[in-house]
Swiss-Prot record:
Organism of provenance: Caenorhabditis elegans
Domain of life per record: Eukaryota
GO terms (BP aspect): cell-cell signaling; intein-mediated protein splicing; protein autoprocessing; system development
Signal peptide: 1-19
UniProt KW Hydrolase keyword: yes
Protein's name in the database: Warthog protein 6
Stored SUPFAM superfamilies: Hedgehog/intein (Hint) domain
Residues annotated as site: Cleavage: C394, F395
Length: 593
């Protein structure tokens, strides 16, 4: 008896542990469709199923029963994202450390006509009910649950993202039977076998109509005519290449879900930039000697009066010596003593193929009253420039962002504010983890990109923005703001946070004061209702996002100390970024920069 009691207790204990480790959320099988999902107070999901009558799934005596042509896969730890799939079952397994969600994906041909309705978030104690949709008193569609994703929100609570699709109803079985002729059971079977075996006399000629007659398929190239000519030559049929849908080139460095263009053809530096209209005929000078010295002195806006005559008739010919010292239109001219004696002097590195006999009056290039601070630094070919150390890639201060508390100017944002952004395919709020740049007195040049309906955004040259072709079903791609063209489409959000395309109608340059570059946890941000990126380098976007996320976690340990003051609150780059990126330059290839 003691052994039996111990065995009985062991069975009860094992059953309790097994019941706690595996939670069955239900399965619809192949004869029903999921339409309802509930999440209990403990965060465990349960789905409910229904056999919609508008799809012909009914077992009543008045209608002929029909079974959906559905094929289901076993439970796997995946999301049913294919076009013809829905989530038919859920199983939650506790492996000791965390709970994993496994789904049963079923495929049905009728899902090819289904359309996306919405995506909702379900937390503990919440539910969603879909089902039959009626329009004008008739059944028009069925709202079903297609995709289910398990996430954890900012409060460390389980949350499920449910994708709801609407599948249109088919014609009922009664209406389809009324349209068919009244045939016996044997004749109905023969009618169904016509297309496969072609053995029914009533529809015997349906294949012969599709094929050309034998005489036309074997037509001779020469035909006898009852005329003065013996033969008549037929023209050969032109063979054309069949139409095939073009495919985009595959790029192994592409990042999901973006589509990138193929690499451009290599070309020489400053190719096709020589101005042919200003070329004048003149005598060719002798080749320069080997003792040429490069002169890198900048051009002076003051016009130097030359010591030699300026008319074409009095202009001296070039000397026939190896130490020829000509004049270059972009540099100051030499004085009279140096020019007449022809001594060896410093010359510019660039020497044109010939010198025109007549030199026009020097016109100094227009110099602006100020130089933007960010443009003088250039685009540095190292990681310091990519992480924001040398190239300021930012937004203008008058741009607006949407937060959970309402609309704010981008210059008024603070670390921790949740702004509207994109997380994969969902429009959601993401926290601002730091500012790459936040300088109120910085003067910069911005690209003002506008659409016909009033949307606009201001970006510096190398800041990334999402664009695509204005055709339907075109992929998104990240390009620099200076590379946006008039034929491109940018992506804006509506009042209901739905992303749509808008064609660019105007691109201009503006000068404004103040640069701001907030960094969100997702790496993207919606500014002035326009989707853009927080970064300035496409190849290292993931590296930049990972670097700043790790820095934020590490610096939070020292943030509460009295002697530590976070530089990100002041708008500067994090402490030590330039040192760390200089070390990373030794390990990361320059081809990624």
């Amino acid at each position: 008896m003691t052994l039996l009691n111990l065995f009985y207790c062991f069975c009860l204990l094992f059953g309790a542990v097994l019941a706690d480790s595996i939670h069955d959320g239900g399965s619809c099988g192949t004869n029903s469709i999921p339409y309802k999902m509930e999440v209990d107070s403990e965060g465990k999901p349960v789905i409910s199923c229904e056999a919609p009558s508008c799809l012909g799934v009914s077992s009543s005596a008045a209608r002929r029963p029909r079974v959906l042509d559905v094929s289901c896969d076993p439970f796997k730890e995946i999301v049913c994202v294919k076009d013809l799939q829905w989530t038919s079952g859920l199983v939650e397994i506790n492996n000791g450390t965390h709970r994993t969600l496994k789904t049963e994906c079923c495929s049905y041909e009728g899902m090819s006509d289904a359309k996306t309705i919405k995506s909702i978030f379900l937390g503990p104690g919440q539910s969603f009910v879909g089902g039959m949709v009626e329009k004008d008193g008739e059944q028009s569609g069925f709202d079903l649950i297609k995709e289910i994703r398990k996430t954890v929100n900012a409060d460390n609570q389980v949350q499920y993202i449910v994708g709801v699709y609407r599948m249109p109803c088919e014609a009922t079985s009664d209406s389809s039977e009324e349209a068919l002729p009244l045939l016996s059971r044997n004749r109905r079977k023969l009618r169904d076998r016509v297309g496969k075996y072609d053995d029914y006399e009533e529809d015997r000629n349906y294949r012969s109509e599709r094929r050309r007659p034998f005489a036309m398929r074997r037509r001779a190239l020469l035909q006898r005519l009852e005329d003065m000519y013996d033969d008549y030559d037929y023209e050969f049929r032109v063979v054309r290449r069949p139409f095939r849908k073009s495919r985009l080139p595959y790029n192994e460095n592409a990042l999901w879900p973006l589509q990138y263009s193929s690499p451009q053809r290599s070309r020489t530096f400053a190719d096709n930039t020589y101005n042919k209209e200003t070329v004048e005929s003149g005598p060719l000078p002798p080749p320069p000697s080997s003792n040429y010295i490069d002169n890198v002195a900048p051009a002076s806006p003051v016009v130097q009066s030359p010591a030699y005559p300026q008319t074409p008739a009095e202009m001296p010919l070039p000397p026939q010596s190896g130490s020829y010292s000509g004049s270059y239109s972009g540099y100051p001219t030499a004085d009279a003593s140096q020019y007449n004696a022809y001594p060896a002097m410093q010359q510019p590195a660039y020497q044109p193929a010939y010198q025109p006999a007549y030199q026009p009056a020097y016109q100094p290039a227009y110099q602006p009253a100020y130089q933007p601070a960010y443009s003088a630094r250039g685009y540095s070919p190292n990681l310091n420039g990519l992480f924001g150390g040398t190239g300021m890639q930012c937004f203008s201060g008058d741009m607006e962002v949407e937060t959970e508390d309402g609309i704010k100017m981008i210059k008024d944002l603070k670390i921790g504010d949740k702004v509207l952004s994109m997380d994969e395919a969902f429009v959601t709020y993401s926290p601002v983890i730091m500012f790459l740049h936040k300088r109120d007195e910085e003067i910069a040049e911005f690209n003002l990109i506008e659409t016909a309906n009033g949307h606009s955004i201001k970006l510096t040259d190398n800041h990334l923005i999402y664009v695509s072709d204005c055709r339907t079903r075109s992929d998104l791609k990240l390009v620099a703001a200076k590379e946006v063209k008039m034929d491109d489409c940018i992506h804006v959000t509506t009042d209901s946070n739905v992303v749509i395309k808008k064609k660019v109608s105007k691109i201009s340059k503006v000068i404004e004061t103040g640069i701001y570059s907030p960094l969100t946890s997702t790496g993207d941000i919606i500014v002035n209702r326009v989707l853009a990126s927080c970064h300035s380098n496409l190849a290292l976007k993931s590296l930049q996002q990972t670097f700043f996320s790790l820095y934020k976690r590490t610096s939070s340990v020292f943030h509460n100390l009295m002697f530590f003051k976070s530089s990100t609150e002041e708008g500067d780059l994090p402490v030590g970024v330039e040192t760390l990126t200089s070390v990373m330059d030794l390990f990361i290839p320059q081809s990624f920069v």
